[in-house]
From Swiss-Prot:
This is Aspartate 1-decarboxylase. The gene is panD. It is an enzyme of class 4 (lyase). Heterooctamer of four alpha and four beta subunits. The keyword Cytoplasm applies. Is synthesized initially as an inactive proenzyme, which is activated by self-cleavage at a specific serine bond to produce a beta-subunit with a hydroxyl group at its C-terminus and an alpha-subunit with a pyruvoyl group at its N-terminus. It catalyses: L-aspartate + H(+) = beta-alanine + CO2.
Length: 115
């Protein structure tokens, strides 16, 4: 069994942040579905602007909204407009892994390429 990349939103743009919320990353539900992210799933975030890497969990955002909002303590690690990578990993048996679901996004969090 191996720990492999399962889902990735590449170049997502932070649309909002809320330090006073209990935590999480709110992601447009349509984007979640495209890369197979589930509510409350653990994700690793890498901020391309400042190099920060941290973990949080996913909550659903309004479908079609383009929302990428960091909440709670994680909100202190990003700024609106930062470009981030959202990654989720899974444990797979040899032979069952077919690669990650990857969506590359533009500055409005619209999908420009699927891998």
């Amino acid at each position: 069994m191996r720990f492999m990349l399962k889902s990735k939103l590449h170049m997502a743009c932070v649309t909002d942040k809320n330090i006073n919320y209990e935590g999480s990353i709110e992601i447009d539900e349509e984007l979640m579905n495209i890369v197979d992210l589930k509510e409350n799933e653990l994700v690793l975030i890498a901020d391309l602007n400042n190099g920060q890497r941290f973990e949080t969990y996913v909550i659903k955002g309004k479908p079609g909204s383009g929302t990428i909002s960091l909440n709670g303590a994680a909100a202190r690690l990003v700024e609106k407009g930062d470009r981030i990578i959202v990654m989720s990993f899974g444990i797979f048996n040899d032979g069952e892994y077919s690669g990650p679901k990857v969506a590359i996004l533009n500055e409005k969090n619209q999908v420009i390429h699927l891998k």
